[in-house]
Amino acid sequence: MTTQEIIEVIKGLSVLELNDLVKACEEEFGVSAAAGVVVAAAGAGAAAAEEKTEFDVELTEAGDQKVKVIKVVREITGLGLKEAKDVVDGAPKVVKEQASKEEAEEIKKKLEEVGAKVTLK
């Protein structure tokens, strides 16, 4: 199997399947994917004085119109129905990581229009 074929297979995986793949790779090779995140977080401290350009969009509360919120979460994330429902039921959950300011504001607006409470971090 070529590198390109592996990439194509990975592109077809859901978020939950990707999470399982990362965990399996960590166990198989005795590494941690979190190590890179720690390094990135250390560098982010210096950039904190500058204006923040990337945001995590957190679904804080689903509100009364849960079905509509699930539909919007599916639209934003590309998740299947069950995965999107799990995200909404498990609120507070991050629905989009490292979104640009404009994208984060747009996602927040869409979710708030259907009654959800959203926090940008």
From Swiss-Prot:
Pfam families: Ribosomal_L12, Ribosomal_L12_N. GO terms for molecular function: mRNA binding; structural constituent of ribosome. Keywords: Ribonucleoprotein, Ribosomal protein. GO terms for cellular component: cytosolic large ribosomal subunit. It comes from the Bacteria. PANTHER family: 39S RIBOSOMAL PROTEIN L12, LARGE RIBOSOMAL SUBUNIT PROTEIN BL12M. Homodimer. Part of the ribosomal stalk of the 50S ribosomal subunit. Forms a multimeric L10(L12)X complex, where L10 forms an elongated spine to which 2 to 4 L12 dimers bind in a sequential fashion. Binds GTP-bound translation factors. NCBIfam families: L12. Belongs to the bacterial ribosomal protein bL12 family. This is Large ribosomal subunit protein bL12. The lineage of its organism: Bacteria, Bacillati, Bacillota, Clostridia, Lachnospirales.
